[in-house]
Regions:
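Short pre-active-site segment immediately N-terminal to redox-active cysteine/selenocysteine motifs
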Residues: 88-90, 95-98, 163
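Loop/turn elements at helix/coil->beta-strand transitions in domains of secreted/extracellular proteins
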Residues: 86-90, 118-121, 144-146
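N-terminal targeting signals for export/organelle localization
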Residues: 2-69, 189, 210-213
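Thiol-/selenol-based redox modules, centered on thioredoxin-like
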Residues: 169-213
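Structural microenvironment flanking redox-active thiols in thiol-disulfide oxidoreductases
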Residues: 103-142, 151-158
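C-type cytochrome heme c attachment motif
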Residues: 97-104, 166
């Protein structure tokens, strides 16, 4: 599809050069179509385009994380300060139901969460949807036992989320030590990441990116 789109754009562009005043307009439209078509091959990130608060970010990498209380779709509550009293890290995974890349990485995230359940708390936050039954069914249909948090829209602006899935790690010192936009599509990456944050050698906050795991 991408090859056909680019060839079509080239042919129309050549034709438009002979069309006088319509050339610029048509070329502009074709360029937009090409950009859209060629970008469709990147299937690891589903980008949210209609959020008006993307620029109102509160938190960034290296910041101290505030204390928040969240409630999952089953009525269980999770407070960051209480979690960090018994865990070595909190992982926030932002997703939404129709996000293909989110579904792609969930098995890897679930496996890592199960392996490091004693040391790491993983919360799956859906900031765009508060439909409890749909979220519960999604978890059941995808064999997921992670705590699913519904409809926390303020997180979009709090972290200036620009795509889904987004994974953020709050380390044992309460600092944001990791942030990644896009699906983790290789087995073992989440486990390597979790191993880093639970290690006894983790003596102070260290900000890392996905390529370091």
């Amino acid at each position: 599809m991408k090859l056909h789109g680019c060839l079509c754009a080239a042919m129309l562009n050549d034709c438009c050069m002979k069309k006088g005043i319509f050339r610029k307009l048509i070329v502009f439209i074709i360029c937009l179509l090409c950009i859209s078509g060629c970008g469709a091959d990147d299937n690891t990130t589903a980008v949210l385009l209609d959020n008006p608060n993307l620029s109102e970010s509160i938190y960034s990498l290296g910041d101290n994380m505030g204390d928040y209380k969240l409630t999952d779709v089953n009525g269980n509550t999770y407070t960051f300060s209480e979690l960090l009293a018994t865990k070595k890290a909190i992982v926030l995974n932002f997703w939404f139901i129709n996000c293909g890349p989110c579904q792609m990485e969930f098995p890897y995230l679930q496996a890592a969460a199960d392996k490091y359940s004693n040391d790491i708390a993983v919360l799956a936050i859906n900031p765009t949807d508060d439909r409890e039954n749909q979220i519960k069914n999604y978890a059941i249909n995808n064999d997921l036992s992670l705590p699913f948090i519904k409809g926390e829209q303020e997180w979009i602006s709090a972290f200036s989320l620009q795509g889904f899935p987004t994974t953020i790690v709050i380390d044992r010192y309460g600092k944001i030590a990791f942030s990644h936009v896009g699906a983790v599509t290789e087995e073992g990456i989440f486990e390597d990441m979790f191993k880093h944050f639970v290690s006894d050698d983790y003596k102070h906050s260290i900000v890392k990116n996905i390529n370091e795991f």
